[in-house]
Each structure stands twice: as structure tokens, then as C-alpha cells.
């Protein structure tokens, strides 16, 4: 049986995410630990952290995963944005430790006029700065991107290069987003193509570093650079591709977390049911 879940809201209080995940039938889940669209945040109180930890223990589900806010850009040439991004990463690593959440997923950013090589270096430097004083027990997961203009991390080799520049590599893992990969040109539509893509991942990064799958179908065609998630099996990757991912022997034990729409077509419960159907 695969471990499957979705991204859930922390509205009201962070511990409510656990009950929302449980209500949806999740084995695992992802949250933002704070408002993802701003730089400011409310510190976690000891009480709120304790209630969250207790709720997790009682639920029997996990791991929980935190996703970084949207604004940080670790490849930015603008020093104010760059310094805020590093600070934000440091804060999120600490918040994960307080909540006893082992995984923090982050996008890497956009390099702008710096170019790819300098952008990768900036990303690695930012991570090195943030990890210097980061508490133990939290892994930072670098997420592949969809190939938007000037983005860092759409090429698996770029992620491997960045990891090679990080000093404390034992703290680094990877989150693979299927929608992003397909949009960046990695074909996932058949059993053989899934095998080829993850062979490339193993060669350029190492499958031993892969810790979470963002299992999303996609609206965009192969190589489109379009980051538009679709319901499981209803997008360009399709049922055969999703089934092949779920049955890949090196992936099957990983947490599969969806960031799919909730609309009249299907809700989170429906997408979880679809994944479990395809995983049989």
C-alpha cells in the first residue's frame, strides 16, 4: 500500500491541519507553516506546537511536510530579496524543528540577469548560510521546477550541481514534482518513459536522495514550461503514467503528496481514492 496525501490548510490553528488530513483519509500531508504569500509571520508558541505534536501522535499519520512560502528567491541578484530569502529559510527550518516535522520542501528561485551558473551558486550559498545554525532533525528538500523562464532547478543536473556545492550535504534531500518534470520535458506517460526519467534522476542526483513525490497530473503538454496541476489521471501524464510512477520499485515506499485542484470534477478525497485505485 502506498502512502498518499494532499496539501491541507492550517486556517484557524496549525493543529487543525492534522484533523483536515485525517478527514480526507491521508497517510501523509503537506502544509505551509504560515501565510505563504508574505514575508511576515507569527512566531509559533510552545502551546500551539505541543498541540500539533500531540495531534500528530494521536493521528498515526505521517510524515508531515512543510512547504516554503512563495516569495523567497535564493537565486535573486537583489540583495534585499536574497537576504530576506535566507532569513525565511532559516525561520522555516526552525519552525519545522519546533513542530517535529522532518521535511521542508523549497523551490530554488529565478536567476534573472545573473545566468544559470551564478544562479546555482547563489542558491547553494543561501542554503549554506541557512544551514549553519539550523537545528538538527530537519531535512531540506530541493524541488524541481517546471522550466519557467530563468528558473533554477528544472534540469535535474542543475539540482545535482547545487547539491555538490552544499557543505552539509547530509541535510539535503529532493522532492520530485511530476507536473513540473513533465512541463520541463521529462516524459512520464508510460512505464518505459518513467523508468528512463528516474534512471536519469539516479545518474544526475541519486535516487537515495529522493524523499517525497509531489504527485500531480498536468494541464500543459510535454516541455511546455506550464505549471498547471490537473486531477490525477485526467491530465497529460494520464492514468498509465501515474500508475507507472506509483509502481516504480524505487518510489513505491515514498510519501506521495498531491497538490491537485478541488472543484466540481473531483475533490481531495476523490484524488486520494484515484491514487489508491491506480496503486493496486
Language-model features: locations:
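N-terminal pre-domain/capping segments
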Residues: 1-68, 72-91
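Active-site beta-loop-alpha junctions enriched in small/polar residues
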Residues: 7-11, 34-36, 69-71, 109-111, ...
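Acidic (Asp/Glu)-rich catalytic clusters
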Residues: 19-26, 45-65, 90-100, 128-136, ...
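Conserved, mostly hydrophobic/aromatic
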Residues: 21, 67, 85, 96, ...
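Conserved active-site loop/cleft motifs that coordinate metal ions or position small ligands
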Residues: 30, 211-214, 253-260
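Active-site acidic/histidine proton-transfer and metal-coordination neighborhood
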Residues: 58, 74-173
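Short, electropositive alpha-helical surface patch
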Residues: 80-93, 116-129, 155-164, 192-199, ...
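Acidic/histidine-rich catalytic cores of soluble enzymes
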Residues: 124-125, 129-230
Amino acid at each position: 500500500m502506498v502512502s498518499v496525501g494532499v496539501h491541507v490548510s492550517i486556517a484557524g490553528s496549525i493543529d487543525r491541519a492534522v484533523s483536515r488530513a485525517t478527514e480526507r483519509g491521508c497517510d501523509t500531508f503537506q502544509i505551509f507553516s504560515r501565510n505563504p504569500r508574505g514575508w511576515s509571520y507569527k512566531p509559533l508558541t510552545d502551546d500551539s506546537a505541543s498541540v500539533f505534536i500531540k495531534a500528530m501522535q494521536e493521528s498515526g499519520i505521517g510524515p508531515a511536510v512543510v512547504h516554503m512560502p512563495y516569495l523567497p528567491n535564493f537565486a535573486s541578484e537583489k540583495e534585499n530579496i536574497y537576504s530576506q530569502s535566507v532569513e525565511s529559510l532559516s525561520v522555516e527550518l526552525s519552525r519545522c524543528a519546533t513542530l517535529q516535522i522532518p521535511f521542508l520542501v523549497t523551490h530554488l528561485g529565478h536567476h534573472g540577469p545573473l545566468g544559470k551558473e551564478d544562479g546555482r551558486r547563489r542558491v547553494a550559498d543561501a542554503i549554506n548560510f541557512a544551514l549553519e545554525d539550523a537545528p538538527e532533525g530537519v531535512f531540506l528538500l530541493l524541488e524541481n521546477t517546471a522550466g519557467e523562464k530563468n528558473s533554477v532547478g528544472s534540469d535535474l543536473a542543475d539540482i545535482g550541481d547545487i547539491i555538490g556545492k552544499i557543505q552539509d550535504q547530509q541535510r539535503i534531500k529532493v522532492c520530485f514534482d511530476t507536473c513540473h518534470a513533465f512541463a520541463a520535458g521529462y516524459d512520464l506517460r508510460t512505464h518505459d518513459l518513467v523508468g528512463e526519467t528516474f534512471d536519469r534522476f539516479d545518474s544526475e542526483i541519486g535516487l537515495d536522495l529522493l524523499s517525497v513525490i509531489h504527485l500531480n497530473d498536468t494541464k500543459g503538454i510535454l516541455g511546455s514550461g506550464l505549471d498547471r496541476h490537473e486531477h490525477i489521471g485526467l491530465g497529460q501524464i494520464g492514468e498509465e503514467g501515474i500508475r507507472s510512477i506509483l509502481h516504480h520499485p524505487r518510489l513505491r515506499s515514498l510519501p506521495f503528496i498531491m497538490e491537485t485542484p478541488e472543484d466540481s470534477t473531483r475533490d481531495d478525497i476523490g484524488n486520494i481514492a484515484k491514487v489508491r485505485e491506480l496503486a493496486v
